[in-house]
Each structure stands twice: as C-alpha cells, then as structure tokens.
Amino acid sequence: MTTETLTQLEQHELFIRRHIGPESTQQQEMLNFVGAESLEDLTQQIVPGSIRLNRDLAVGSSCSEAEGMAYIREVADKNKVFKSYIGMGYYGTEVPSVIQRNVFENPGWYTAYTPYQPEIAQGRLEAILNFQQVSMDLTGLDLASASLLDEATAAAEAMALAKRVSKAKKANIFFIADDVFPQTIDVVKTRAECFGFDIVVGPASDAVNYELFGALFQYTNRFGEISDHTALFAELKAKKAVVTVAADMMSLVLLKSPGSMGADVVFGSAQRFGVPMGFGGPHAAFFVTRDEYKRSLPGRIIGVSQDTRGNRALRMAMQTREQHIRREKANSNICTAQVLLANMASFYAVYHGPQGLKVIAERIHRLTDILAAGLTAKGLELVNSTWFDTITVKGGDVAAINARALAAQINLRIDSANDNAGSFGISLDETTTRTDVSELFDVILGSEHGLDVAALDEQIIKADSASIPSELVRTDAILTHPTFNRYHSETEMMRYIKRLENKDLALNHSMISLGSCTMKLNAATEMMPVSWAEFGNMHPFCPLDQAEGYTQLIEELSAWLVDITGYDAMCMQANSGASGEYAGLLAIRNYHISRGEGHRNVCLIPQSAHGTNPASAQLAGMKIVVTACDKAGNVDMEDLKTKAAEVADNLSCIMITYPSTHGVYEETVSEICDIIHQHGGQVYLDGANMNAQVGLTTPGSIGADVSHLNLHKTFAIPHGGGGPGMGPIGVKAHLAPFVAGHSVVKPGRESDNNGAVSAAPYGSASILPITWMYIKLLGYQGLRQSTQVALLNANYVMKKLSAHYPVLYTGRNDRVAHECIIDLRPLKEASGVTEMDIAKRLNDYGFHAPTMSFPVAGTLMIEPTESESKVELDRFIEAMVSIRAEIAKVESGEWPVDNNPLHNAPHTLADIMDPAFDERPYTRQEAVFPTAAVKANKFWPTVNRIDDVYGDRNLMCSCAPVSDYE
C-alpha cells in the first residue's frame, strides 16, 4: 500500500504537471545540461537580483481541474441570463452546433497563429477569404479587410482612412450622425481627440452644412429607422467628403447595399452571424471600401496569389501597409484581430447560404412587423416609421413597462432623457420566436391585450408591409459563389471544415516556437466555460445586477493581475495587445493634460521595439523619437540619457519591453525608469514578454507606470489564428483615474466618464474565464514554476543550438530569458541560404517557423514556452541541426544554391508524385521525410512556396473564380 498522505493523493497540484511540458526527471536532465542545480538556481543566474520578487503571489494555491470547474460554475451561475432586446450592436444568435463543435471548440482552429506562414495556413486563409467575400457581397463594395476588433474601433479606423484619402485636404471636421450607436461615437471621439480632428454630432441631414473630410452614418440607425441616403451621400461626395457607414450585417441580407447608395467605406459587427454576445465580445468587425483606397485599408487583407507550381494559393496581401513593417507610418496598429470569430461568421454564411440567411432575416423582420402592428393597434406610437428588426416605442408608463419586463426576465432598451425621453426600444434577433413576441405583448400591454400573433401575421401578408420601403429592398443577388451554395447539410459542412483544418498547422500538431508570441497550452478545462450560456448569452449593456458572476470574475481576475504586475489597478477594456498599448498611452496622455502639461507628447521608443509600439504611439497623438540599442541588444544608456535630456520639456513617456525583444533581462531597466521619471515622463512597459516575469519580478517593482498584458500570450487565451486577444492594462495609482471609461455602462469608478477604446465596457469579456481558470488552476506555485520552466526550455534550446548556429544575444551568465535569437546572416553569406528558406524548410519537418527577422533582420527568434516537453524540444532541435547539415551541403557545392531542399521548400505531395522530381539533386525521402520523427507524424503543406510579389501585383481578395469549382 502507498505511504502517501490523503493530501498528496488528492493531487491539488496535478494541473501544474499537466500544463508544464517537461516532467521533473526531464527538467533535471535539462538543468544538468545547461549547468544549473535547480530551477531556483537557474532563476538566480538569469534574473537580476535587484528586481527579483521575494514573495509568493497572492493568487491562492493551485487546485485540481474538477475543483476549478466547480468554482467557475458557481461564478457563472450568478449571472442572470435574461432575454435581451437591447440591441445597439449586440444580438442573440444561434451558433450552429457543427460550427461550435468543429471550429469554436476545436484546437485545430483556436490554437493556430496569425498566418504569416501561408503555406501551412491555407485552411484558415480560405475561411477568412470567405469572410471578405461575405463582407463585399453584403456591402456592395470592392475590397474587404480580413477582420477588425469591433464595430466602434472599425468606425475610428474609417475616420482615419477618410482623412488619409479625402481630397478635402484643408478640412478637419468629421461629422457623426446623432443616431449612431453611442458607444461608437464615444470611441471615435476618443481617437479624434488624439488626431486633433474636430467632431460634429448632429442630425444626418446637417452634414452638408460643414466642410468635412468625412462623415459617419448608421444603417439602420440606433432607433431602428432605415433611410435612403443616396442623395445625401452624393452631395457630400461632391464636396470631397468620404462617406462611411456603420451597417448591420444581417439587415444587409434584405436591404439595399450602402455601396449602391454611394458609401465609400462600410463596416460593422459580424457578431450576429453565429457568434455569442459574450457580455461584449469577442466579435469580428468587417471593413469594406472601394478599390481605389486599397493602400489605405487598415488591418490584414487576404489575397489570392500562386505558388511556384503556378497553383492558386492564399496569403496576407500588401503587408507593407502594416505596423510590423511601416511602424509609426502604418495605416493602423492592428495586430491581433478576431480571426477565429471572423471564421465562425464566414462558416455561418457558408452553412446557411444565401437562401438560409434570407429566411433568417425575413423571420426577424416579420416578427418585428407583427410586434409593431400589435403595439400600434393598441394605441402606442412608434418613433420610427421604417425598420428591419428594431422599433422604438413612445407611450405608456415606461417605468412600469420596464418593471414588468424585468420581472419577466426581459431587457428592453430604455432611452435616456436626451434621446427620445419616455420611449423604449426593442430589437429582435435570430433567437426570437412567436412565443417571445406574445410575451412582449403581455409585458407591454398587459395580459388582456387580445392580440394573436398568427392573426397579425395574416394581416401583414395581406397588407404587404412597407416597413422596408420598396426603394430600399435589396434586388441584387448575394453569395452566388459555389462555396456558399454547396455545404448546407451537416455532413458536407463538417467535412468542409475538416478539409480546411487539415491544411493548417496548429498547436495540436506541433510546437509553435514564435518568439514574442508565447504559444503555450490552451488547456481544455480553461476553455470549456467559454461555451457556457451563462457567459455567452449576456448582453454587455444589461443591468449590472444581472451580471454578478461577470462582476465577481472581473474583480477577482483584476485583483490577481494587480498582484502579478505590481500595479494598483486594472482596466479590462482593450481587445488586443496593440489596443492595450493605445489605452495605456491614452492614460499617460490624459494624466499629463490633467497636470497642465498637455504639451508632453514625445514618446521614446528603442529601435528594437515591436512595430505596434510606434504605431500605437502615433494613434495616441505622440511624436516618436527612436533610441539606439548597443551591440548587446540593450537600450544604449548614453543615447537614452541624451535623447531624454533633449526632449525633457515635452517628454511624455518611453515604451520598453521587458525582458527586451532581444530575449535578455536588461540589468539597467530600473535605471531606464529613473531617467524617464527624472525628466517628467512616464514608463510604458510592454507586456509582450510577461511570460518571463510572472512570479519572478513585476513591472511595478521595476519602476514602470503602466503595462498592457497579452492575455492571449502569457495567460493562456488562444491565438485563434489571429485573434481573439485581450490587452487589459495595469496602472499605478496616479494613472488609475485616466484609464478608459464608457458612455453606456458606468459602474461607478472615477474613470467612468473618460473616453472609450472599445465598444464594450469590458472588451472581450467572455474569454476572461480562460485566464481566470489559468491562474486559479496553477496557483502561485504553478505560475512561478511555469515561468521558470519557460526560462529552462529557452536556455536548453539555446545551448543545444549554439553548437550549430550563432546565438545573437545573451544576458548575465551567458543566459537568455524565455526566448533566444539565432543569427543566420553568416550562413546566408556563406551559402546563399536565406532565413526564408530555413523557415519554409521547417514546414517540411512539421514545424511552424520561429519569428523571422525580428527584432533583427536575418535572424530567427525562438520561444518554446513552458508547455513543451523535452521530447518536443529535442524534435525541434533535431530538425534545426538537420537543416544545418543541409546548409553545409549547399556550402560545399554538393547541392546547387537554387536547387536544394531548402530553396525548394516546402514540399508537397504533388512534388514527390512528379516524375520530374528525379532530376533534382536530392531524393524524395530527403525532401519530405528528412528524419524518422517526421515520418512518424508527417504534416503535408498543401501548396508550394507562395509568390508574394505576384500576389501584390495582381491583387485579388475574393473567392476563386467559379471555373475553379467546375
């Protein structure tokens, strides 16, 4: 019998062993190899003593997965899921089970990374291309981006695009119709203030009275009215203004497209295409414009190109517009951008097809007609005379009606005194039934109303409803492409999703060692609560007493993150890391303004910074001054002192990353903070590398004032192929009054009236349970050990590879932090083999390439994370060593520079079936089975290397021609 205690047998710490890849014996082997006695010894060798944390985190002890699930269930059950008719951009929807099970809950979809390596991402690239096609068809415009963060931030991007492309160069006014959703107006105003734009809000017809560079309209408007703005748009465009429209995706199935009215930019939320409300997110936004504005489009664009065989292949197009290349000159700071949710929306459109979508839209509209007919028959007045799914009602005792509604677990939209005082709104959706409409009659009119839904339906059919004016009824065909007309049975849809999934490499196949990306385990237990209705079906603008579970979760998570970061407060609003940067910089900006120092607008940024840093600083209205790095990759202290002194009067802040983007703990980080503070500035510490800090040090103790946290990196939210993400910011007490507020939801904080950075008050709230579970399950012991094993794995890989590749930077005791950079430039010079060749060759070995040419061109940055086992690390090391041997054959002349496994990588099944392969100087086995490990678990790229130049010169961002399907 065992001699273990009951406490040991209860295995409260079992999840720690599930999350961390190397077992204890493997850890010791690795420690022995790198020359450390223990994880604590390794920590002391790597982390500077001056910043080391000498206490346990106050997050509680680890618990079992069963205990964690029980805790989160108690929290979820405190949410009261009412039937919400609030609308305002958030609606009930049915998530098709085939999509929920095979996409939303499938690690093959949610653990992939942004498709920078398109040869191993053709599946999700096709799904995103479908999303672009849906967006273009419904809006009637030429070119769509892949996805944006939400409708409100898309509106801000539309304003920025309008300023870039408008020919009214002297105009500085952006007009917003006063019937646009208030949260959208809020976010646009916040962005406009940073840019120095003048915002005018008024009735839509007033737009022509101003000299504008752009204008924004809502279609349908917040009260439900549908307006034909064709003449207004023409008048505005004659004055050189750019017309932007926020549109409802479901309504566009039935309504005349904004593009046909003359709109230049159309955007909106794709949430009601099968993505739960989730208390605000995550949801993908669509963004479509005219072809002539393609170079000014924000965010990713998926385009069609060809591979080396001339076959059709997909890729991210025109990347030179984006932050990772153009930095502060980029069109936007967009990086992570809700790709998983865009994929869900695109699959929703594929599954239902044009006819299925029309039935859904017509059902919503018919039920709205019935509701309107019944209420007006009983003497109530409607504010709007036209509608798709929303009516605004005047008359009756609104307070009493609302009280009856709440008693029946129904949420109505109660308009404020400034907006149709004494009225209430009702927005119906895909989940609304005839029973729901009958219940609404009971609540609004009393149970003796005598109305019958079926009878009202007959009346409407006979009367031929005019709630959508004939001139606004859509007459053109949508979604005619074969993709949207062939996968309508669940069997066919399941197979289509699987076929696309099989083209992609995700964490469910192998390690993804992207430096600065932290592709760690997204544990199933952490993910499961996201699917629960108690989290998914909550409207973000519901009364807060219905969201006690969310409130508790957010408060507990905020308290844990405050302790982990050493800050004093958290703000959960930002929907991505880049959005968090913007939010943090706004807090700094507003802090300076409050002190009468609004002139402080210079942001110092090291030349090694991630591209989002300068792009975000530019969005916050700051001027960027770049500081140099020394030969060791650290911030050049002399240059920093000089630059800080030169701009002292106008210094706003510095943006640094810690550990540095070069993968080392800089010894001078606290001195950097002191220098900035001495010159009146604030310190923004980018949280991209927080996975090397948790439990070992904190940004607050280092001396920083604000950081964003990538919850989709350090704290286990999956990357989703390019989103969702969360970028909450932690701040010191003096910045807490200046974090983002919200125009609709005001929980009673000092920051309530500040401008918003996202549409929802808590951003993508429905994925916060993942991070809550991650911290709850690991506890203080597991969080610290995870960080230590991340350091161990990185140093193990670094030391193993150092015998074959130069390691560019190391820190104290010749160690790296959680990632390492190998320098390929000497090999390129000696052999002609490029970093791109090595990246593509890794695909043949079944691996996603590490981060390429960042922060230094001609390098690979490797971050293995703590979740990878020694077996997987050794498999990756074996692949890299084998590739080095292949390079040696090119160096020696055995293989030609332009005809070898690296130059021709990746290899497909078509390659090895081609008789012409016999003419190559290497064998089929060398091409596709270079090691025994590859043979045991082969991943087959479905296209050869893609021609980027061809794709940009022949830009095509819609589905393939019908001939490809014949």
Swiss-Prot record:
Record keywords, A-Z: Oxidoreductase, Pyridoxal phosphate
One GO biological process term: glycine decarboxylation via glycine cleavage system
Catalytic activity: N(6)-[(R)-lipoyl]-L-lysyl-[glycine-cleavage complex H protein] + glycine + H(+) = N(6)-[(R)-S(8)-aminomethyldihydrolipoyl]-L-lysyl-[glycine-cleavage complex H protein] + CO2
InterPro entries: GcvP, GDC-P_C, GDC-P_N, GDC_P, PyrdxlP-dep_Trfase, PyrdxlP-dep_Trfase_major, PyrdxlP-dep_Trfase_small
Modified residue annotations for N6-(pyridoxal phosphate)lysine: K713
EC number: 1.4.4.2
Function: The glycine cleavage system catalyzes the degradation of glycine. The P protein binds the alpha-amino group of glycine through its pyridoxal phosphate cofactor; CO(2) is released and the remaining methylamine moiety is then transferred to the lipoamide cofactor of the H protein.
Family that this chain belongs to: Belongs to the GcvP family.
Subunit: The glycine cleavage system is composed of four proteins: P, T, L and H.
NCBIfam families hit by this protein: gcvP
Protein name: Glycine dehydrogenase (decarboxylating)
Species whose genome carries this gene: Shewanella halifaxensis (strain HAW-EB4)
Lineage: Bacteria, Pseudomonadati, Pseudomonadota, Gammaproteobacteria, Alteromonadales
Name of the gene this protein is made from: gcvP
